[in-house]
Amino acid sequence: MAQEADGIRLDQRHGKARVRVGRVWRHAHDGSHHFVEWNVSISLLSHCLSSYRLDDNSDIVATDTIKNTVYVKAKECGDRLSVEEFAILIGKHFCSFYPQVFTAIVNIIEKPWERVSIDGKPHLHGFKLGSENHTTEARVEKSGALNLTSGIGGLALLKTTQSGFERFVRDKYTILPETRERMLATEVNASWRYSYESVASIPTKGLYFSEKFMDVKKVLMDTFFGPPETGVYSPSVQRTLYLMGSAVLKRFADVSSIHLKMPNIHFLPVNLSTKENPSMVKFKDDVYLPTDEPHGSIEATLSRITSKL
């Protein structure tokens, strides 16, 4: 919300970024522990125009206070909760506790700590770090209105066949050959928006969003790879991206849109030759040079079209 004074319109926010917190929940019934590591960033939109115009900080919530609040709220959460639930909880607190705060935007990145298994048995308190992150952004209004997104960051996927690229624009700058056989590799960054429009409307089932995160991830991966025996052919990253996004929208009624960013990470064919040995290495879809730059950049947003009737 813009504020005006002295012929100037001011849009402002302040907060605390990269507040790192680890939380352990100990379960007495079986002796197991659950661990999460969160990187929390908070922005507050508030009525504090006087701090910009005058020597008056009376409406500013100190960023150190914002940081401390994250740890206090983490301590108060006696039961395990999802990263989305924690983001909403933090947002609700700032909007209700401080009269001058009308919007809280909470971004959290959850590191992928996974329980280890020893001799096939889940360890009660042992964890290893995985690859892709679980992300969320909750925008909470004082009125209770909510804009909630979840996401996956750094989901590296690769298939060694069932991919090609043909019939693209060819001109005097084009040297790329057409192919129906290539390796397809990408690092998926996805974010999807939920259709819940208020804090009161979110599901009450515990860890609902953690389960939904795993379900969305599975749909994305299943669509990318196809059946385990045969796979599925990809004529382009664009087509595969579209199929992945539309599969999520078809499967999950409470997801209103999804944004996918899928760089085309290249594995270049290796051919080596000399005068003495013209076939030192002759590429037969077997030896590649991995490279991650430059890479193709493909991204799109798919949104559900709702009837206006």
Curated annotation (Swiss-Prot):
A cellular component term, taken from the record's GO annotations: peroxisome
Annotated residues for binding of urate: T63, D64, F165, R182, V237, Q238, N264
Cell compartments where the protein resides: Peroxisome
Keywords, alphabetical: Acetylation, Oxidoreductase, Peroxisome, Purine metabolism
Catalytic activities: urate + O2 + H2O = 5-hydroxyisourate + H2O2
GO MF annotation list: urate oxidase activity
Alphabetized InterPro entries for the sequence: Uricase, Uricase_CS
Pathway(s) where this gene product acts: Purine metabolism; urate degradation; (S)-allantoin from urate: step 1/3
Location of the active site: K16, T63, H266
Role noted for this protein: Catalyzes the oxidation of uric acid to 5-hydroxyisourate, which is further processed to form (S)-allantoin.
Name recorded for this polypeptide: Uricase
Species: Arabidopsis thaliana
